[in-house]
Amino acid sequence: MMTKQALLEVHNLVREFPAGDSTVQILKNINLTIYEGELVAIVGQSGSGKSTLMNILGCLDRPTSGSYKVSGQETGKLEPDDLAKLRREYFGFIFQRYHLLGDLSAEGNVEVPAVYAGVTPAERKQRATALLTELGLGSKTENRPSQLSGGQQQRVSIARALMNGGDVILADEPTGALDSHSGVEVMRILRELNAAGHTVIIVTHDMQVAKNATRIIEISDGKIIADRENIPEYASELNKDPDAAPAIANKQSKGKSVSAFRSMLDRLSEAFQMALISMNAHRMRTFLTMLGIIIGIASVVTVVALGNGSQKQILENISSLGTNTITVFQGRGFGDNSKTANFKTLVPSDADALSSQPYVTAVSPMVSSSKTIRYKENEATATINGVSNDYFDVKGLTFKDGQSFDQRSVRDLTQDVVIDTNTQKQFFTDGSNPIGQVVLLGSVPARIIGIVEPQTSSMGSDDSLNVYMPYTTVMSRMLGQSNVRNIIVRINDQYSTSAAENAIVNLLTLRHGQQDIFTMNSDSIRQTIEKTTSTMTLLVSAIAVISLIVGGIGVMNIMLVSVTERTQEIGVRMAVGARQSDILQQFLIEAILVCLIGGVLGVLLSLGLGQLINKVAAGNFAVAYSTTSIVAAFVCSTLIGVVFGFLPARNAAQLDPVAALSRE
């Protein structure tokens, strides 16, 4: 006769629990050996310690002292993940209250242990369906636990226990919540499993249930008081032809495992699906949790877009002053009331001297005067700008019709004039062509030779009337002066504008014998405005980030509540073999998913607000979104999920399996 092999070995096992300042001893020097293929019943009344013993046998708990070995492996000093591995590979649990996951179907519940064992999804599904079919639930695979009777739920629990092979079946009061008929069916299934080679341990207070076992162990007050063989009434059935037994009685082989990487992906997929299921089950709470993230992300993205839009518009207005331009003024600065301000030393020859410098592309002296324009019976006040032929290129003005005056016109003091479209609308309301028409500028007649688009001012659109004539004509025929108001210099792109600015100041100071001029560099203004708007955007964004932090705290609070609500689910997952990292991963993914979806909705809200702002502002200012800010929003929402989701996830991962299972 073949010698039985010891499967579970307990020696001098003691389990104590703290009770105030002292401890209470629940199990007292337990010595027990369970062999492969046994059908054992552990019998005892409430408080006898039988459930504590079952928890230790199933690696859900640890002994305070003593030794417990599974297939010769000492468990007392194993890490939590090592105990989880033993639960996956050796044990299948059948609970009195079934402990099925309410958000999963019957098939989904049965598949859970195989997820953590690294079995392929296809094989998981095939095996779960086969087990449920063999247990008479082939038509109920998609039903939720709430749609099943107590007996059907217990059979799902049995199928789950067998999913990873179930070498040892631990049944805690398996008939306690069932009617008599369902209880008989469950015991029959357990007997068949034992006949097929499974080691079955039944924990019960009912001696009638215990009599189904071939070995009965009685426990009282934490001690084993009896350990005897038993001949059950169904013993004669064990000698029947095994081929006559249902397929469920044949010991199932473990599923094929996959690579560690594929197993990790499967567990991630499972965690992702469970996160979606949990979010869908509490839609309103999930939305309210997301709301802080939505508002925070929308605020940050919108503020950055407003800053970018404002900066872009201001820089476009600066560009209307001319790109790479330096304007030379008389005096020492705006508002200069010194004698230098009254000197009339800035003259056209200064412009000629500047035009010969290698860093200069174009130069235009400028004078101006306000005069009344008359054409037929119409008259209006306009600004007469005396400029050179290069002025239009320097300022980037676009011709709508006609052409500019040339260098000969400047030399010969011609009375040619270029008008802007505002002037055209004022005087040529009938749609006639202004080109070639003569208008009276003050008392000076001038022939229109071109039409330009109006120059945009720094405050937006400008409706003022502007006309342009050769500066020599304006100086001699209108103002009677020899000096110019300012000189606009366009710098060669290959030269630094700051270096060119210093060179201009030095040159004119040398020509005038003193520094009686100052400059305005368009690039310096651009850089100053860019820096200022960036700083303001950063400051306002920092304020908006506060709402993101508040949203993150909201996510953490709700996830802590979720962990509390789902404590029993966590216990079930640990019982079927989930590692601490699996639990941490599941709740962390849920937090990240909440924040990511909140980030997507926040960006969409921001885009909607941008459209509204652009429509309401009607060109006064605009929002300009950047890919960088949107990507940063998603990264930020993900980090919030990780940071604020870690504490709840860590709390979930560190739960004690026994305490989690006992939580209602």
From Swiss-Prot:
Under the heading Pfam families, the entry gives:
ABC_tran (PF00005), FtsX (PF02687), MacB_PCD (PF12704)
According to its record, what are the GO cellular component terms?
plasma membrane
What the protein does?
Part of the tripartite efflux system MacAB-TolC. MacB is a non-canonical ABC transporter that contains transmembrane domains (TMD), which form a pore in the inner membrane, and an ATP-binding domain (NBD), which is responsible for energy generation. Confers resistance against macrolides.
Q: Which organism is it from?
A: Acinetobacter baylyi (strain ATCC 33305 / BD413 / ADP1)
User: What are the protein's GO molecular function terms?
Assistant: ATP binding; ATP hydrolysis activity; transmembrane transporter activity
Which keywords annotate this record?
Answer: Antibiotic resistance, ATP-binding, Cell inner membrane, Cell membrane, Membrane, Nucleotide-binding, Translocase, Transmembrane, Transmembrane helix, Transport
Which InterPro entries does this entry report, sorted A to Z? AAA+_ATPase, ABC3_permease_C, ABC_transporter-like_ATP-bd, ABC_transporter-like_CS, MacB-like_ATP-bd, MacB_PCD, Macrolide_Exporter_MacB, P-loop_NTPase
Task: Provide the transmembrane region boundaries.
Answer: 287-307, 543-563, 587-607, 629-649
In terms of Gene3D superfamilies, this protein maps to: P-loop containing nucleotide triphosphate hydrolases
The compartments listed are: Cell inner membrane
Its name, as the record gives it, is Macrolide export ATP-binding/permease protein MacB
**Any idea which positions bind ATP?**
44-51
Regarding protein family, the annotation reads: Belongs to the ABC transporter superfamily. Macrolide exporter (TC 3.A.1.122) family.
